[in-house]
Regions:
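Conserved GNAT acetyl-CoA-binding A-motif
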Residues: 115-126
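Conserved acetyl-CoA-binding loop-helix of GNAT-fold acetyltransferases
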Residues: 97-114, 131-136
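Conserved GNAT-fold acetyl-CoA-binding loop/helix
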Residues: 22-42
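A short beta-loop-alpha structural element at the N-terminal edge
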Residues: 2-16
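Conserved active-site alpha-helix within GNAT-family acetyltransferase domains
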Residues: 126-143
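Conserved acyl-donor/pantetheine-binding loop and adjacent beta-alpha core of acyl/acetyltransferases
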Residues: 67-100
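Conserved beta-strand in the GNAT
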Residues: 55, 61-71
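Conserved catalytic-core motifs of GNAT/GCN5-like acyltransferases
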Residues: 122, 140-154
Length: 161
């Protein structure tokens, strides 16, 4: 597997992965985190423009997609709980793997860790598969953050290399 910046021509494959992820979430007790239209095309376009959008390729096919930045996350400034530290960190958002892939999400998370050595991430309380992945990868539960515009709460996790 390898990671690269996403390109506009990757968007159809990324959208197919997001559609599968939404269906997977609904079928696994998490119908509201991404609903029917998240992430929006505007979010995808913004991630591409800011060079925050990545794809994971496996044998020439896009196996996963995610957003990654080391520019911080405004919603992480206030947490009910405590982050492990105040050091600079990377943020992973909108990680999703294609149907039938194995190990792509772990590979993406490990790649992000290799970029900066300190990762923060959040997920929905109903997203048990993601919580399981974070636990398997050694992330520490730090508390609860509030999304912007009153869109709800998320469980917050952090890990150091």
């Amino acid at each position: 597997m390898n990671i690269r910046h996403a390109a506009p021509e990757d968007v159809p494959a990324m959208q197919a992965i997001f559609e599968y992820a939404r269906r997977f979430m609904r079928e696994n007790g998490n119908p509201t985190q991404w609903g029917d239209r998240f992430p929006t095309q505007e979010m995808i376009d913004r991630d591409l423009a800011l060079h925050r959008s990545y794809v994971c390729e496996d044998e020439g096919k896009i196996a996963a997609t995610f957003s990654f930045t080391t520019d911080g996350e405004p919603t992480y400034q206030v947490i009910r709980g405590a982050w492990l530290d105040d050091a600079p960190y990377g943020v992973v958002h909108r990680i999703a793997a294609a149907e039938g892939t194995h190990g792509a999400a772990s590979f993406c998370m490990e790649w992000c860790m290799a970029q900066c050595g300190n990762i923060r991430i959040d997920t929905h309380a109903d997203n048990k598969p993601m919580q399981g992945l974070l636990n398997k990868l050694g992330y520490t539960y730090c508390g609860v953050i509030e999304l912007e515009n009153g869109r709800g709460e998320r469980l917050a996790f952090q890990k150091h290399a």
